[in-house]
């Protein structure tokens, strides 16, 4: 695909410099990041990252789930409801 269009955005200069430094450490430029991000958005029809910040309860629940803490396994919904007593 030919790169023949330009994208411009106004951002804080300090933010731009900080991001450019981080990306340079990864071997990328800001243009590379924009190209990668827009390609993923076009292909997946969604943002390639989550804009929401989980609260502490959600973070702890995810950690517990990944560790297998308080995880209930069931063959179907009725079995799960029976195990949970509902």
From Swiss-Prot:
It holds the Pfam family RelB. Keywords: DNA-binding, Repressor, Toxin-antitoxin system, Transcription, Transcription regulation. InterPro entries: Arc_rbn_hlx_hlx, DinJ, RelB/DinJ. It comes from the Bacteria. GO terms for molecular function: cis-regulatory region sequence-specific DNA binding; toxic substance binding. The keyword Repressor applies. GO terms for biological process: DNA-templated transcription; regulation of DNA-templated transcription; single-species biofilm formation. Gene3D superfamilies: Met repressor-like (1.10.1220.10). The keyword Ribonucleoprotein does not apply. Belongs to the RelB/DinJ antitoxin family. PANTHER family: ANTITOXIN DINJ-RELATED. Antitoxin component of a type II toxin-antitoxin (TA) system. A labile antitoxin that counteracts the effect of cognate toxin YafQ. The YafQ-DinJ heterotetramer binds the consensus sequence 5'-TTTGAGCTACA-3' in the dinJ promoter; DinJ also binds DNA but not as well as the YafQ-DinJ complex. Binding to the dinJ represses expression of the promoter. Probably a dimer in solution, forms a heterotetramer with antitoxin DinJ, with 2 YafQ-DinJ dimers associated via the N-terminus of the DinJ antitoxins (YafQ-(DinJ)2-YafQ). This is Antitoxin DinJ. It comes from Escherichia coli (strain B / BL21-DE3).
């Amino acid at each position: 695909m030919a790169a023949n269009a330009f994208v411009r955005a106004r951002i804080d200069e300090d933010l731009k410099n900080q991001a450019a430094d981080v990306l340079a450490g990864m071997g990328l430029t800001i243009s590379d990041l924009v190209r990668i991000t827009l390609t993923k958005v076009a292909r997946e029809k969604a943002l390639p990252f989550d804009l929401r910040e989980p609260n502490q309860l959600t973070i702890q629940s995810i950690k517990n789930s990944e560790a297998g803490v308080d995880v209930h396994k069931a063959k179907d919904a009725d079995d799960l409801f029976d195990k949970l007593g509902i």
